[in-house]
Amino acid sequence: AKKIIGIDLGGTSVKFAILTQEGDIQEKWSIKTNILDEGSHIVPDIIASIKHHLELLNLSAEDFIGIGMGSPGAVDCFEGTVVGAYNLNWKTVQPIKKDIESALGIPFFIDNDANVAALGERWKGAGENQPDVVFMTLGTGVGGGIVAEGKLLHGAGGVAGELGHITVDFDRPFDCTCGKKGCLETVASATGIVNLTRRYADEYAGDATLKRLIDDGEEVTAKTVFDLAKDGDELALI
C-alpha cells in the first residue's frame, strides 16, 4: 500500500514523518528551519531532506499517494501558496506546492498548521472522528482549527480558526504582530507570558530573581518564567 509524507513546518524546526494510510508513523526526523534570506532556504531544504531520506529508505515517488504539510501564515490550500508567515521571514507569496511537486513528483497538499492539527486530532486523537471538533494550539502564539459537520472551516481569507486574534484586552492592550492591539495571543501565549512579566516587573518592588534579570536587560523567555515559577520565584508566580 502507498504511504504518506507529513510535514510540520515551524519557526524553529521542520518535522517530517512517513506514515501508512491508517496513520501509523513508520519513520520520523527533523531539520532546523533556516529563516535567513527571507526564508528562501526553507523549501529547498525540505526538498533535499525528503530526497535524502527516500534514498536512504530505498523509496521513490511511486511509493507515495501524497505529501501533506501544515504551515504558519495565511495558506491558500487550492493554489498551494503561503503568505505572511512572519516567523519564517516569508513576507511575499511562496509557491510551495509548485516547487515541491516539480522537484519530487508527489502530489502535495498544504493548509494552515492549526487546521491540519485539528484534522489530525480528530482522526487519531481526542476528536475520535466526531463530526464537530475545535482544536487550539498554544505556543509562541495562539492558533486554532474548527471542524464542523466533518469539514474543516476555512472562512473568509482562510483564517476561520485563528482564535489568537480575538481582541480581549481593552484596558492596557499590547501591540500584536498582526498589527492590531489587545489580541488574545498578546496575553495568553509564550509571547503573552513575557509581555505580562515585563508589565508586572515594573509594578513589583520585591527582590525576585526574575525582577533582577529584567532590570539587568537579560533575555527573558516564557521558559525562564516557568523555570523560576517552579523554584517559587515571587514575581514569576504573580
Residue ranges and their predicted role:
Residues K3-A48, T81-G84:
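Short glycine-rich, Thr/Ser-proximal phosphate-binding strand/loop in the N-terminal lobe
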Residues D8, D113, G139:
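Active-site glycine-centered loops adjacent to acidic/histidine catalytic or metal-binding residues
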Residues D8, T20, C77, V147, ...:
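Short, acidic, Ser/Thr-enriched surface-loop or helix-capping motifs
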Residues T20-Q21, S71, N112, A148-E149:
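A cytosolic small-molecule/anion-sensing beta-strand core signal
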Residues I35-E62, K180, L184-V187, N195-I238:
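Adenine-nucleotide phosphate-binding core of ATP-dependent small-molecule kinases
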Residues G39-A48, D63-I67, G73-V134:
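Glycine-rich phosphate-binding loop and adjoining helix at the ATP-binding site
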Residues E128-V187:
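Glycine-rich phosphate-binding loop of actin/hexokinase-like ATP-binding domains
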